[in-house]
Design a protein with these regions (language model features):
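Generic alpha-helical structural element
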Residues: 28, 164-165, 193-196
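His/Asp/Glu-enriched, well-ordered alpha-helical/loop segment
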Residues: 171-241
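Histidine/acidic residue-rich metal-binding segments in metalloenzymes
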Residues: 1-159, 166-187
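Short, surface-exposed alpha-helical recognition segments that flank or form part
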Residues: 164-167, 217
Length: 241
């Protein structure tokens, strides 16, 4: 989508007092730190929820640390932006291949970053090697398959699947999870997942590791894991642990 269209959506949503969120990227810039800069600028002074900030700090343009610090700086100077980040190394993306090319630019980027060709054979090898996992949901639990079983499942679905790569660097996850404003509030308002779609719901597991490390205390963990998200959604009876 062209950025001017996104700007119009943001303006209209704010006029209507509607919540608006953006998984950044446009026809001009991808889902990376450049796309993040673009989204912040497009919002102007309007409210905008920019989803999963850590996803734009994977070292595609600069290095992971510099990208995370830039994202934090932009959020500090634009309090109109609501944001969250997840704590898992896994991303979520489509693994569909058409005409020997993955249809998702995110998948293409992941394959290249991990040393695989962005082709049918490259995707197949990434799954076989365990660099990518194919999401299998049996109605009870979602899990990632790799190796021979993953390839067989992927091919049985004619590649029409989703899955994950381990492409979220620890440094950007850590920096964004713990960054604070001068008033002590968090730069990234909440921890997040995809609501169970992908097996990366590690808010408790990895969040408590931040507490154990000393980067957060238990009260701060509860604020990021529950309270801020509940407040943002207007859930008055939620937000405690």
């Amino acid at each position: 989508m062209d950025v001017d269209i996104s700007e119009n959506f943001i303006e209209l949503a704010n006029q209507k007092k509607s919540w608006i969120a953006w998984h950044v990227g446009s026809t001009a810039h991808g889902s990376n730190i450049e796309g993040f800069r673009e989204a912040v600028a497009a919002a102007k002074d309007n409210f905008l929820h920019i989803a999963h900030i850590n996803s734009y700090c994977r070292g595609q343009i600069s290095n992971e640390t510099d990208e995370a610090l830039e994202a934090i700086s932009l959020l500090k100077t634009h309090p109109n932006i609501f944001s969250e980040s997840y704590l898992s190394p896994l991303n979520g993306t489509r693994l569909v291949v058409q005409n020997d090319v993955p249809i998702s630019k995110v998948t293409v980027t992941c394959l290249k970053k991990l040393g695989y060709e962005p082709t049918y054979d490259g995707m197949k090898k990434a799954i076989f090697d365990g660099a990518a996992g194919v999401l299998v949901d049996d109605g009870v639990i979602g899990k990632l398959l790799s190796g021979k079983g993953g390839v067989e499942y992927w091919e049985s679905k004619e590649t029409k699947t989703t899955g994950s790569f381990k492409v979220n660097p620890a440094v950007s996850r850590f920096l964004i999870a713990t960054a604070k404003r001068s008033d002590g509030s968090f730069v990234g308002d909440s921890f997040s997942t995809d609501g169970g779609c992908y097996p990366r719901n590690v808010i408790v597991e990895n969040g408590l590791l931040l507490v154990k490390f000393g980067a957060l205390n238990l009260n701060e963990y509860a604020v990021k894991a529950s309270l801020n998200g509940a407040r943002a959604l207007g859930l008055k009876n939620k937000g405690h642990l």
